[in-house]
Amino acid sequence: MDTLAQLTQEHDALRILLERIEAAAEARDAVALSASLQAARAALTSDLDAHISVEEAEAFSPIAETLGAGLVAPFYEEHVEIRATRDDVYARLERDEAPYAQALRLCDLILAHQQREDMMLFPSAREAVFR
């Protein structure tokens, strides 16, 4: 499986977890939100960090070299914002807070980011860079 296909597959797997988190946060169900965030902890921490590392090294770098750094710059910036928001969500959870707004923001950030990658960036890169 090529790198872009692997990354897209990882997006699909994470999307399922994010939908559960989003539903719990929208319902303002503290118990369900906590359970969903705990169930997704590895996916949103170590797995997400590994995913971002692969994405930046094996996808963004070649795309930047071929199509220009300006194309991927916003995606790098979003990675920083996603990690910071994620860290805030889990810090609040550790303080026994129900981070409804922060969890919704995290879901929105990741889902929008994934959609732009899967629908715009990766198809363009597949044609121009990863033939």
Model segments located where?
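Small-residue-biased structural context
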Residues: 1-131
